[in-house]
Amino acid sequence: MPLLDSFKVDHTKMPAPAVRLAKVMKTPKGDDISVFDLRFCIPNKDIMSEKGTHTLEHLFAGFMRDHLNSNSVEIIDISPMGCRTGFYMSLIGTPDEKSVAKAWEEAMKDVLSVSDQSKIPELNIYQCGTCAMHSLDEAKQIAQKVLNLGISIMNNKELKLENA
C-alpha cells in the first residue's frame, strides 16, 4: 500500500497552531486543487476535545469561506483529522500560507463571537449525525488557544521524513 502524503512528514517536528500546504494537484482541466494542514495541536502532545472539534467542524468551514474565498480561491471542504490535532482544508486554487493563517485567525475570532449553542449551523437531527455531541464552550476554548499562541507557517522541507 502506498504511503499517504500525510504520513511523509515528521509529526514530532510539527509546530502548532500552524499552516502547511500539504499537497497541490491538477484537475483534468488544469485547475489547482490544494490541501492545507491546519494543525491546531502539537501531535502526540495535545488533542482537541471531541465535542469542541465537532462544533468547530460546523462553524469553521463557513467562517473560513467568509475570509478566504475569492475570485481565485474556493474552499471545497474542511474536515477534522481523525487524530483530533487539526483539520484538512481542500480548495480550488492555491492561496499563500500567510493568507490562510490570517483567514484562520479571523475565523477563530468569529467562533468566539457565537453567542450560544442555538447559533451553531446544522445542529439538528436532520443535518447532523451526532447532534448531541457538541460544545460551544469547548470550541471557544480551542479558538482562544489558537489566538493566544498565534499561527505559524510549517516548512515541508524541515518536516520531511527520511526514506518517505
Curated annotation (Swiss-Prot):
PANTHER family referenced in this protein's UniProt entry, alphabetically: S-RIBOSYLHOMOCYSTEINE LYASE (PTHR35799:SF1)
Cofactor info, note text: Binds 1 Fe cation per subunit.
Domain of life, per lineage: Bacteria
Pfam families reported in the protein's UniProt record: LuxS (PF02664)
Keyword Metal-binding set for record: yes
Keywords carried by this UniProt record: Autoinducer synthesis, Iron, Lyase, Metal-binding, Quorum sensing
Gene Ontology molecular function: iron ion binding; S-ribosylhomocysteine lyase activity
Heme in keyword set: no
Source organism per UniProt: Campylobacter jejuni subsp. jejuni serotype O:6 (strain 81116 / NCTC 11828)
Subunit record text: Homodimer.
Cofactor needs: Fe cation
Reported function: Involved in the synthesis of autoinducer 2 (AI-2) which is secreted by bacteria and is used to communicate both the cell density and the metabolic potential of the environment. The regulation of gene expression in response to changes in cell density is called quorum sensing. Catalyzes the transformation of S-ribosylhomocysteine (RHC) to homocysteine (HC) and 4,5-dihydroxy-2,3-pentadione (DPD).
Enzyme Commission number(s) of this protein: 4.4.1.21
Catalysis performed (reactions): S-(5-deoxy-D-ribos-5-yl)-L-homocysteine = (S)-4,5-dihydroxypentane-2,3-dione + L-homocysteine
Protein name: S-ribosylhomocysteine lyase
Binding site for Fe cation: H54, H58, C128
Family: Belongs to the LuxS family.
Record-level GO BP terms: quorum sensing
HAMAP family noted in UniProt: LuxS
